[in-house]
Amino acid sequence: MSAKEWLAGFATLLGVETPTAEEIRDLLVLAGDAAHASERIAAPVACWLVARAGLSPGEARKRLEEWKEKGFARQEGEGGSKD
């Protein structure tokens, strides 16, 4: 089963629309930034926070970019993901 098929099935199970290609891309960027700026666990939890906040993936990505510009997305001295 492809990721697209799995996501479509899970979306149906949850009673929501299947994410668009753009939404998936925005979530992957967000997850990647979270995992590389912190620990891997931050990736799925960051995506959960987007949903919890009721934001679109695009809006969350925009806010993340603003946060990064202010220098807050990576703690000083952090070099990347930790396991």
Enumerate the language-model features and the residues they cover:
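An acidic intrinsically disordered interaction segment
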Residues: 1-25
